[in-house]
Curated annotation (Swiss-Prot):
One of its GO terms (molecular function) is phosphoribosylanthranilate isomerase activity. It comes from the Bacteria. Gene3D superfamilies: Aldolase class I (3.20.20.70). Belongs to the TrpC family. PANTHER family: INDOLE-3-GLYCEROL-PHOSPHATE SYNTHASE (PTHR22854:SF2), TRYPTOPHAN BIOSYNTHESIS PROTEIN (PTHR22854). Coiled coil: none annotated. PROSITE patterns: IGPS. Disulfide bonds: none annotated. It catalyses: 1-(2-carboxyphenylamino)-1-deoxy-D-ribulose 5-phosphate + H(+) = (1S,2R)-1-C-(indol-3-yl)glycerol 3-phosphate + CO2 + H2O. Its EC number is 4.1.1.48. This is Indole-3-glycerol phosphate synthase. Keywords: Amino-acid biosynthesis, Aromatic amino acid biosynthesis, Decarboxylase, Lyase, Tryptophan biosynthesis. Pathway: Amino-acid biosynthesis; L-tryptophan biosynthesis; L-tryptophan from chorismate: step 4/5.
């Protein structure tokens, strides 16, 4: 999947006239591209409020990050659970009206989740870094900042807001970007979950030899449709490679019942990221128990 960055000049001036016309490449081709293009604007706005230098100054006051990777690896529940806090999505709109992030985080911890993922994108998912900060005060579990990260600034902001891990999406980042952003996270002692959707993206990640936590996204980020067969296809071809190189595979999205979990367990998946399935339930703890007690 090729995701373009926004053209530097989104309009073209018409000769001898007092107006400009849109550049032919100035319109996003899909939802993911639209999200990524908006991130440039969002980051500029963040920097107007808090500079990168000021963010970095706040790092010394923080406690060391919790070990997200080890929490999944040594989870009592198999596969380990990254339980997600998400109010809305571009494809489904508002998922949870009664949205109380701190209460949700407490429910996840009581239920046995290994880690918690927090959506911080505001425009498309109605998340925020303030929500991440609130969740940090409500749980001792490692936290993943779930955003569309394209800049070092976002990593520092995530860390200052309480994140222990970040998500990097292969589809929106070049190899150089992936390597650079991973290095920053490593320097901050944060875990990195790198996300792929197909074999081509996975081959890129494996060639970098830098990632030990790989998320297989069952959701096509161009269409936002989910298909659990994505994980099955990738694991059928790469499970031996994952084992050989001590890579922990995570299956993300589209996991709806205990049969799905049994299938993923049987093919070597070590962790699952589940959000919408829990967000639609009035009783999250009971839903969690029903889902995992039968596997």
């Amino acid at each position: 999947m090729e995701i373009r960055r926004r053209p530097p000049n989104p309009t073209v001036r018409v000769e001898n006239l007092e107006y400009a016309v849109p550049h032919r490449e100035a319109k996003a081709k899909n939802i993911l591209e639209e999200i990524v293009w908006y991130k440039d604007t969002e980051i500029k706005n963040f920097k107007k409020i808090v500079s990168l230098e000021d963010l970095i100054k706040k790092l010394d006051k923080l406690s060391p990050p919790k070990d997200f990777f080890q929490s999944i690896l040594h989870s009592k529940i198999k596969p380990g659970v990254i339980a997600e806090i998400k109010k809305a999505s571009p494809s489904k709109g508002v998922i949870r009206e009664d949205f109380k992030p701190k209460e949700i985080a407490s429910c996840y911890e009581k239920s046995g989740a290994s880690c918690i993922s927090v959506l911080t994108d505001k425009r498309f998912f109605q998340g925020s870094y303030e929500i991440l900060q609130d969740v940090r005060t409500a749980t001792n579990l490692p936290l993943l900042c779930k955003d569309f990260i394209i800049s070092a600034y976002q990593i520092y902001k995530a860390r200052v807001s309480g994140a222990d891990a970040i998500l990097l999406i292969a589809a929106i980042l070049s190899d150089d970007d992936l390597f650079y952003l991973k290095k920053i996270a490593d320097n901050l002692k944060m875990s990195v979950l790198v996300e792929v959707h197909d074999g081509q993206e996975l081959e890129r990640i494996l060639s970098l030899k830098s990632f030990n936590l790989i998320g297989i996204n069952n959701r096509n980020l161009k269409t936002f449709k989910t298909d659990l067969k994505t994980s099955i296809r990738i694991m059928s071809k790469y499970s031996d490679i994952f084992s050989k190189h001590n890579i922990v595979p995570i299956s993300e999205s589209g996991i709806n019942n205990s049969d799905d979990l049994k299938t993923l367990n049987s093919i070597g998946i070590k962790g699952v990221l589940i959000g919408e399935r829990f967000m639609r339930e009035s009783d999250i703890e009971n839903s969690f128990k029903k889902l995992f007690n039968s596997i």
